[in-house]
């Protein structure tokens, strides 16, 4: 049957996953007043039915492993697919903003992950974006050296030619009065946000500056460059305070610890490592390994000061817990990867959890939801993916293709399908119990019942003799009757030992 030209195609309905944090948050607000003391720890039971009792990550602040976002939720992609360079959650956590290589900003719903808005904001590729601390402004940099101001509705209000080459990173000051930009021209610039004027130009790197971050509460800048150096700057005078020489290749991103004192700086590099520097000692205290190729991005958990996540150029995602003893993490990693040679060290740390096949290509950007229950990643494979923490006793969360790989997951899926088909096509034989019960009424039957597995058991005396069962009170009952006739002999019952002709017991007369 031919379809009319203007007929509407009815698409097949599909289920859409959603991660609604409202129920857990409301339950936490109600029950937090019932805690015995402020040190009370809520522990979810390992049962899928306990998902209704799953509280926000803040309730499990003493156990950061309960909030490792390793469960795949959804993949979002535009109709015209392009490389995703930037992912940023809005300050209220209701939407996600992504910036692509074509200069487009896309807004995605934070609950159902569906498309909401697309805006052609830049003429060049979007390289960086950052929300102000109060959430009222968004600034972004592109491949043409432009910095643009946006309102929350993505209305462009100002354009600044900040650099002659690509703007690689931007960061706001703690009070939103200034911001800093890093560029491929080898310099950093400090700007007055309200006046849009340049205040300082920081030079000292010998090559492209790939990243910059402003300390959440101090007048301190950290930058990373293609010259393998990490530098700290004073934004008031423009002088270089210190230089760190830990990495052996290009620094891809530097990020200060959010909140909780912000005493640490995490940096990732193309030397396949992530280093955590202590600002008080000005040296690295942890070296995070586990990536086989370049590490492109890093993000701190918004609620746990000791949990951070990295994304690699091979599409892998690694979660690290800084509280875990290094030797213990090395032992666990060696059990998973016995072919990898490890060097025991007091500061080498390996992943607490891994997603080896999170994306098909390199990951350029990642960020946690403000509540900490979701992780978003943007990749060179032109997709944006959402990850959440595992549910109680969720054994299937690590059995998908993102953890096992395409080939192994397909093999496991084919095995499951074969097992289901075998169960559907199963035709049971004649029930042996029916034949056994039929033989039980056979007078010639002797021995035990013919049950499966008991055929070789020795025979026992049969309860049947000459077709009559030897049961007290039923000596004259036959198997053909449904009910046994009462015996004509006197039954010995206390108080009824003898009976008169009129039917009354003699001892009651």
Curated annotation (Swiss-Prot):
GO cellular component terms, A-Z: chromatin; cytosol; mRNA cleavage and polyadenylation specificity factor complex; nucleus
Each WD repeat, start to end: 72-109, 113-151, 156-192, 196-234, 238-278, 282-321, 350-388
Protein known as: Polyadenylation factor subunit 2
Entry annotated with the keyword Repeat: yes
Coiled coil: none
SUPFAM superfamilies: WD40 repeat-like (SSF50978)
Species whose genome carries this gene: Schizosaccharomyces pombe (strain 972 / ATCC 24843)
Keyword terms of this UniProt record: Chromosome partition, mRNA processing, Nucleus, Repeat, WD repeat
Region (Disordered): 385-409, 480-509
Entry-linked PROSITE patterns: WD_REPEATS_2, WD_REPEATS_REGION
Biased composition (Basic and acidic residues): 390-406
Cell compartment(s), UniProt: Nucleus
Domain of life: Eukaryota
Function: Required for 3'-end cleavage and polyadenylation of pre-mRNAs. Also involved in chromosome segregation where it has a role in chromosome attachment to the mitotic spindle.
Principal location class: nucleus
Record-level GO BP terms: chromosome segregation; co-transcriptional mRNA 3'-end processing, cleavage and polyadenylation pathway
Keyword Ion transport belongs to the record: no
């Amino acid at each position: 049957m031919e379809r009319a030209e203007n007929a509407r195609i009815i698409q097949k309905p599909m289920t859409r996953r959603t991660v609604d944090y409202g129920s857990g948050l409301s339950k936490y607000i109600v029950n937090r007043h019932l805690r015995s003391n402020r040190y009370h720890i809520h522990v979810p039971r390992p049962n899928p039915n306990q998902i209704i009792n799953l509280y926000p990550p803040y309730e499990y602040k003493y156990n950061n492993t309960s909030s490792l976002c390793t469960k795949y939720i959804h993949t979002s992609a535009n109709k015209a697919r392009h490389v995703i360079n930037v992912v940023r959650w809005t300050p209220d956590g209701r939407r996600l903003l992504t910036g692509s290589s074509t200069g487009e900003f896309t807004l995605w719903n934070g609950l159902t992950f569906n498309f909401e808005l697309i805006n052609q904001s830049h003429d060049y590729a979007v390289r960086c974006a950052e929300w102000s601390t109060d959430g009222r402004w968004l600034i972004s940099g592109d491949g043409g050296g432009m910095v643009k101001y946006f309102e929350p509705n993505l209305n462009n209000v100002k354009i600044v030619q900040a650099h002659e080459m690509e703007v690689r990173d931007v960061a706001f000051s703690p009070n939103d009065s200034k911001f800093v930009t890093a560029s491929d021209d080898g310099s950093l610039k400090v700007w007055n946000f309200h006046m849009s004027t340049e205040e300082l130009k920081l030079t000292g790197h010998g090559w492209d500056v790939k990243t910059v971050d402003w300390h959440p509460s101090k007048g301190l800048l950290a930058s990373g460059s293609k010259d393998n150096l990490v530098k700290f700057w004073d934004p008031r005078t423009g002088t270089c305070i210190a230089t760190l020489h830990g990495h052996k290749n290009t620094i891809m991103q530097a990020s200060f610890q959010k909140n909780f004192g912000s005493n640490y700086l995490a940096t990732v590099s193309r030397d396949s490592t992530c280093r955590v520097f202590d600002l008080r000692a000005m040296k690295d205290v942890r070296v995070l390994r586990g990536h086989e190729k370049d590490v492109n991005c890093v993000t701190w958990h918004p609620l746990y000061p000791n949990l951070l996540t990295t994304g690699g150029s091979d599409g892998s995602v690694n979660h690290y817990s800084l509280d875990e003893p290094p030797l213990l993490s090395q032992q666990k990693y060696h059990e998973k990867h016995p072919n990898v040679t490890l060097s025991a060290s007091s500061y080498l740390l390996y992943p607490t959890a891994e997603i080896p096949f999170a994306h098909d290509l390199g990951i350029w950007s990642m960020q946690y939801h403000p509540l900490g229950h979701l992780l978003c990643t943007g990749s060179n494979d032109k997709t944006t993916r959402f990850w959440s923490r595992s549910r109680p006793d969720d054994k299937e969360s690590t059995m998908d293709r993102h953890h096992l790989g395409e080939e192994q997951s397909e093999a496991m899926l084919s095995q499951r399908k074969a097992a289901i088909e075998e169960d559907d096509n199963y035709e049971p034989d004649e029930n042996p119990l029916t034949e056994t019960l039929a033989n039980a009424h056979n007078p010639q039957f002797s021995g035990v019942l013919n049950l499966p597995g008991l055929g070789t058991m020795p025979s026992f005396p049969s309860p049947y003799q000459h077709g009559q069962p030897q049961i007290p009170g039923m000596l004259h009952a036959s198997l053909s009757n449904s009910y046994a006739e009462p015996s004509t002999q006197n039954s010995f019952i206390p108080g009824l030992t003898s009976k008169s002709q009129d039917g009354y017991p003699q001892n009651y007369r």
